[in-house]
């Protein structure tokens, strides 16, 4: 008789995982069945030193235990009914996004400095805590800060703006400063345990590319940079999909020298970043406190743009 997959509740229940192997897996950030099932055998082997064939068996067993298999289109339709949305605070912006920021996907906000990327991330970290009938998910947020842009004072203002207790709101935002690209990747690996065991509904990475660009400059380092960035983005995609959370990443822009007409700016990160997010939103400055948002890539949304405002109390529609 084979081992009943329903008996596998923890990584220590997986066939071939004794105390030593379990310790290696946990030290590498693979602390849950979901984290192992979402990884490739190569990733597990490289991170732990476990032989590739053993890693293959462990990953296969984790996937079988979680019943990762083919689904019908009807199954996907039923699953889509579980997708939730977080209000941005601006009705205009919500309508552009089809109702708000979706769970089970990555939303990328890209634009130049001062275009509103970090402001929206702060607002979402507050709004995710609202009741569902007010556009929230009654959940907590994780804020991975790579550039030191997080401000608790701004959270305080925004919390007051939506009628929530600022101190209670701040207690429900887990902030961490990522010091380099490998630390950033390790943080996301750890989130597979955090998200499973806590009521986390939003993960923010602000910004997703800055460390990778700084640490791997030049064309000679491009392949390594893109490989690491690809792994990082796929972990975020798996996190969003497995746990039904919203993932929001910010990104910088650069000018394309080959564009002579129209807007020459594009998001950094190349094709790797271009394929990962489910929704890509380009933000631009306008007059005063107004900003322009344009959906540039989303399979379920039409391309379009709208105007929102950054006010004392947060993201709002312009007056």
From Swiss-Prot:
Result, substituting residue 5 to Q: In strain: TB1
Pfam family, one: Rad51
Entry keyword set: ATP-binding, DNA damage, DNA recombination, DNA-binding, Nucleotide-binding
Listed GO MF terms: ATP binding; ATP hydrolysis activity; ATP-dependent DNA damage sensor activity; damaged DNA binding
Outcome of swapping residue 289 to S: In strain: TB2
Effect of residue 5 to N: In strain: TB2
PANTHER family according to UniProt: MEIOTIC RECOMBINATION PROTEIN DMC1_LIM15 HOMOLOG, RECA/RAD51/RADA DNA STRAND-PAIRING FAMILY MEMBER
Family: Belongs to the eukaryotic RecA-like protein family.
Record protein name field: DNA repair and recombination protein RadA
């Amino acid at each position: 008789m084979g081992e009943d997959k329903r008996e596998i509740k923890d990584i220590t229940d997986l066939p071939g995982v004794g105390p030593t192997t379990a310790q290696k897996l946990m030290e590498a950030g693979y602390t849950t069945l979901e984290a192992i099932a979402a990884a490739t055998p190569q990733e597990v082997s490289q991170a732990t030193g476990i032989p590739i064939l053993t890693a293959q068996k462990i990953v296969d067993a984790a996937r079988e235990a979680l019943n990762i298999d083919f689904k019908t289109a009807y199954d996907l339709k039923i699953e889509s009914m579980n997708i939730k949305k977080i209000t941005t605070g601006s009705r205009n912006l919500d309508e552009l996004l089809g109702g708000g920021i979706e769970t089970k996907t990555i939303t990328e906000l890209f634009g130049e400095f001062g275009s509103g990327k970090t402001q929206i991330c702060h607002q979402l970290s507050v709004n995710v805590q609202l009741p569902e009938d007010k556009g929230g998910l009654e959940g907590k947020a994780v804020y991975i800060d790579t550039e030191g842009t997080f401000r608790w004072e701004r959270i305080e203002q925004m919390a007051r703006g939506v009628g929530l207790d600022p101190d209670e709101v701040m207690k429900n935002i887990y902030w961490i400063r990522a010091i380099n690209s490998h630390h950033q990747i390790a943080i996301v690996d750890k989130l597979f345990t955090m998200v499973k065991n806590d009521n986390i509904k939003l993960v923010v990475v602000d910004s997703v590319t800055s460390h990778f660009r700084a640490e791997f400059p030049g064309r000679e380092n491009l392949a390594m940079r893109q490989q690491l960035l690809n792994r990082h983005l796929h972990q975020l995609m798996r996190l969003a999909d497995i746990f039904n959370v919203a993932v929001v990443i910010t990104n910088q822009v650069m000018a394309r020298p080959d564009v002579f007409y129209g807007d020459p700016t594009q998001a950094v990160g190349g094709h790797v970043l271009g394929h990962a997010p489910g929704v890509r939103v380009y933000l631009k400055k306008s007059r005063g406190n107004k900003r322009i948002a344009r959906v540039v890539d989303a399979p379920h949304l039409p391309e379009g743009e709208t105007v929102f405002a950054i006010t004392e109390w947060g993201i709002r529609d312009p007056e």
